[in-house]
Amino acid sequence: MSNSEMYRPRSSYFFAGAIYILCAGLIGQSFFSESLEGVLTTIAWCLLVAYVFHLSFVRPKVTFFDEGITITNPLKEITVGWGEIEDIGARYSMYIQVGGEKIYAWAAQAPGRYHSRNIHASELRGLNLPDPLNIRAGESPRTHSGVAVALARIRRDAFISKNLIGCESSTHFNRGGATTLAILIAVTCLITFA
């Protein structure tokens, strides 16, 4: 993986940080107003919520490199070489199409359907869109998905023009994340309902 570039929206850190602060405040407040059982229940629920937000907002990212792309979602990490990608686009989020299957990137969410009304023609220069007169809202350069799609198309075009060899495709399941999530759910249910 040479010349790698990672894309993750900065707003993800803001949302996750806000949840962490809220959970810390709830835990602090419970020490003053709850019994030991209430404090433990609050800690369990706050840890579960904070970890779910960590998986949903902080972990997802898209990594572009000369040979391919890696899409990291909460419980899966998919690496695909540029030569295997049939299409790059954005519907609900940025996606790549490989072998007829669409792989969506959680890190590059598309905006609402009315966003395309606010796009000006000057924003589309140099993006090499297939049909610049009929742009999807998710391909706007002012959106998370639009930035990721533009970066992916630039990297794929460079790959094709240089006749490089793509990387091998791989899929990795986030066992550690899934195990931690399952343990937190079990402990939270045990503390809450026992």
Enumerate the predicted regions with their spans.
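Short, aromatic-rich membrane-interface segments at the entry and exit
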Residues: 35-42
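Conserved beta-hairpin
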Residues: 51-82, 86-94
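N-terminal membrane-targeting/pre-transmembrane regions
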Residues: 1-34, 142, 149-194
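Single-pass alpha-helical transmembrane signal-anchor segments
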Residues: 24-25, 42-56, 183-189
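Short acidic, Gly/Pro-enriched loop/turn segments at secondary-structure junctions
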Residues: 92-103
